[in-house]
Amino acid sequence: MNRFSVLMCLVILSIFHGVPTAEGDVTVKFSLLGSNHKSYSKFITSMRNALPNAGDIYNIPLLVPSISGSRRYILMQLSNYEGNTITMAVDVTNVYIMGYLVNGTSYFFNETDAQLASKFVFQGTKSITLPYSGNYQKLQSVARKERDSIPLGFMALDSAISTLYYYDSRSAPIAFLVLIQTTAEAARYKYIEKQIIDRISVSKVPDLAAISLENEWSLLSKQIQIAKSNNGQFQTPVKIINDKGILTEVTNVSSLVVTKNIMLLLNKLNIASFEDHVISTTMPQA
């Protein structure tokens, strides 16, 4: 292999598998310009691979329970069709978005974990605390819309990136809801990744199965970990809505949700704090 070939391989790896920065962070990138289902899937795969894990349970990576300093975060660079770029900071212990950077200004959610993240990422920038936290309950409340009424897809992602790039405060909560599902939730579930791929050309609202999976990630993660020492059986069934819109119970690891769908497990040591995070309110302003 000649030097040019080696260089090209390194460039490709840097795009799809993450590049360590001077701060020790890892950056994964996705641009809508020239994108298709293959490039999006490669991006989601690279995002999953960038998350450190504590081993596999039933062939599913188990996220680490904790990690210190800047290593707790990866950076996710997103560009829209016009080439506008934003960079999101993602907590590797739960795939939770902490905030984002555009040009020289960083925006962080109004919550304890995001304020901690601001001490390690986007250093040397003008830092702004958003007037809300990053959990679904709060974002939907501020947006005055539920997730099942907000379209997803490449056009929706393009609009979301533009909204945050120019920071339209009225539309920002909806933009975050689109970004979270298009990136973090797609990394957690193959089904949600496919939902986005099915919406490349035309934006549509997510189906109830996708919303159900999003809501039950911590419970599914917990029961899969319990099943490891319980002959593959869940201690408590997890109720989800399937792709036919029917409420069903997942009771063991032979379920397709476990074998073909869930791609990351939230560590059981973090489940209580994650659930508190999901329903938390904003921090009081000083």
Curated annotation (Swiss-Prot):
Query: What class does this enzyme belong to in the EC scheme?
Result: hydrolase
InterPro entries in the record, alphabetically? Answer: Ribosome-inact_prot_sf, Ribosome_inactivat_1/2, Ribosome_inactivat_prot, Ribosome_inactivat_prot_CS, Ribosome_inactivat_prot_sub1, Ribosome_inactivat_prot_sub2
Task: Output the Pfam families linked to this UniProt entry.
Answer: RIP
Keyword Isomerase attributed:
no
Q: Which UniProt keywords apply?
A: Antiviral defense, Glycoprotein, Hydrolase, Plant defense, Protein synthesis inhibitor, Signal, Toxin
Q: Which residues form the active site?
A: 185
Q: Which residues are glycosylated?
A: 103, 110, 252
What EC number(s) does the entry state? 3.2.2.22
Q: Which interval of the chain is the signal sequence?
A: 1-21
* Any single biological process term in GO: negative regulation of translation
One of the entry's Gene Ontology molecular-function terms is: toxin activity
* Listed transmembrane segments: none
Quickly give the catalysed reaction.
Endohydrolysis of the N-glycosidic bond at one specific adenosine on the 28S rRNA
**Looking at the keywords, is Glycoprotein present?**
yes
Give the family, as the similarity comment puts it: Belongs to the ribosome-inactivating protein family. Type 1 RIP subfamily.
Any idea what this protein is called?
Putative ribosome-inactivating protein
Query: Source species, please?
Result: Cucumis ficifolius (Cucumis figarei)
